[in-house]
Amino acid sequence: MLLSVPLLLGLLGLAAADPAIYFKEQFLDGDAWTNRWVESKHKSDFGKFVLSSGKFYGDQEKDKGLQTSQDARFYALSARFEPFSNKGQTLVVQFTVKHEQNIDCGGGYVKLFPGGLDQKDMHGDSEYNIMFGPDICGPGTKKVHVIFNYKGKNVLINKDIRCKDDEFTHLYTLIVRPDNTYEVKIDNSQVESGSLEDDWDFLPPKKIKDPDAAKPEDWDERAKIDDPTDSKPEDWDKPEHIPDPDAKKPEDWDEEMDGEWEPPVIQNPEYKGEWKPRQIDNPDYKGTWIHPEIDNPEYSPDANIYAYDSFAVLGLDLWQVKSGTIFDNFLITNDEAYAEEFGNETWGVTKAAEKQMKDKQDEEQRLKEEEEDKKRKEEEEAEDKEDEDDRDEDEDEEDEKEEDEEDATGQAKDEL
């Protein structure tokens, strides 16, 4: 009897497990999101999120997300989900960000919190597990943050991951694996990867310089030395400047009035500069002394750097100078393939249409500005012509007045 491949894998216990979807939010049910997301009351002036697909989009309904709506504000909003631990499994955090306002300074990242977070008191100092996503502030800061809280300390990545800084929607993905490796993707393409231990300073270094080692006193690091047999020539020392032999005292020089005459100085053609003995290879050269290293007694490997006991809340805790950013398509799962597929089915489906709509708006705006410029120039030309006509009319009236005055003068003469 022949068995199908899926059945055979199932019998062998090798069938792929269904992905665990811990959190997914696409805002497809109108204002119902307000029942799932909690505004922090830690400050009274936190900015407000609104549901919007923005000024341009690929699909007006599918592209709706949480949009920051007030300039120069802190924002603090979060959603809770069933707590889970990522011990022994992959963690994938994914979402889309759209800075349609051409952001100059502001965050576009998310934070994952443990279950003990008081959502109504969430603020910038609330302890989190992971912070991930883009952050832009001026030309100097355009990075993707990947920050882990390790034993109560927030540890930043040692690499610089550049984020997207245009006005379109982009997909950000963080993958943390149980072998203590990670991967960062933008628009479903890898932009960084590596080892958690290598790319963050979670642990003390494996090796340290031997505190008992010291460079031997006779260790010579000079590759070249002065030739002891070389000596300075007897005629070497000449002054750098000498009196000009061609200079003559002016005939009208009065020493009582002008003081003693001194000829100007010139560069001495025989001047050779500072003498230095020639260099030879140092026969005692031993190379650069390298401080020997030993195993660091304070280093202890940690196979669970990646692991957290509790993930339970996803939060948007950020500052924006210019509002307008849209967050959408949140996903927390343990399945890398599912996350990639979800990204392709959301961001991937609407990205082209979004760009087309933006390009069309830009072209319409360009034509509108051209038409306004043309109209303004025509109005300016019309005003200039009207002013010129007025000047011509004034000149004609002045000429007529002068002619009338001349005629009157001539007539008066004739009468006389």
UniProtKB/Swiss-Prot annotation:
UniProt KW Magnesium keyword: no
Top-rank lineage group of the source organism: Eukaryota
Pfam families in UniProt: Calreticulin
Region: 4 X approximate repeats, residue numbers: 191-255
Stretches for region Disordered: 193-277, 350-416
GO BP annotations listed: cardiac muscle cell differentiation; cellular response to electrical stimulus; cellular response to lithium ion; cellular response to virus; cellular senescence; cortical actin cytoskeleton organization; ERAD pathway; negative regulation of DNA-templated transcription
Coiled coil residues, start to end: none
Ranges: Sequence repeats: 191-202, 210-221, 227-238, 244-255, 259-269, 273-283, 287-297
Disulfide bonding pattern of the chain: C105-C137
Residues reported in the UniProt entry to bind Ca(2+): Q26, K62, K64, D328
Subcellular location, record wording: Endoplasmic reticulum lumen; Cytoplasm, Cytosol; Secreted, Extracellular space, Extracellular matrix; Cell surface
Signal peptide: 1-17
Composition skew (Acidic residues), residue ranges: 252-261, 380-408
Residue interval(s) of motif Prevents secretion from ER: 413-416
Amino acids binding an alpha-D-glucoside: Y109, K111, Y128, D135, D317
Record's function text: Calcium-binding chaperone that promotes folding, oligomeric assembly and quality control in the endoplasmic reticulum (ER) via the calreticulin/calnexin cycle. This lectin interacts transiently with almost all of the monoglucosylated glycoproteins that are synthesized in the ER. Interacts with the DNA-binding domain of NR3C1 and mediates its nuclear export. Involved in maternal gene expression regulation. May participate in oocyte maturation via the regulation of calcium homeostasis.
Quaternary structure annotation from Swiss-Prot or TrEMBL: Monomer. Component of an EIF2 complex at least composed of CELF1/CUGBP1, CALR, CALR3, EIF2S1, EIF2S2, HSP90B1 and HSPA5. Interacts with GABARAP, NR3C1 and TRIM21. Interacts with PPIB and SPACA9. Interacts (via P-domain) with PDIA5. Interacts with PDIA3/ERp57. Interacts with CLCC1.
PANTHER family (alphabetical): CALRETICULIN (PTHR11073:SF16), CALRETICULIN AND CALNEXIN (PTHR11073)
Similarity comment: family membership: Belongs to the calreticulin family.
Domain comment in the entry: Can be divided into a N-terminal globular domain, a proline-rich P-domain forming an elongated arm-like structure and a C-terminal acidic domain. The P-domain binds one molecule of calcium with high affinity, whereas the acidic C-domain binds multiple calcium ions with low affinity.
Name recorded for this polypeptide: Calreticulin
Source organism of the structure: Rattus norvegicus (Rat)
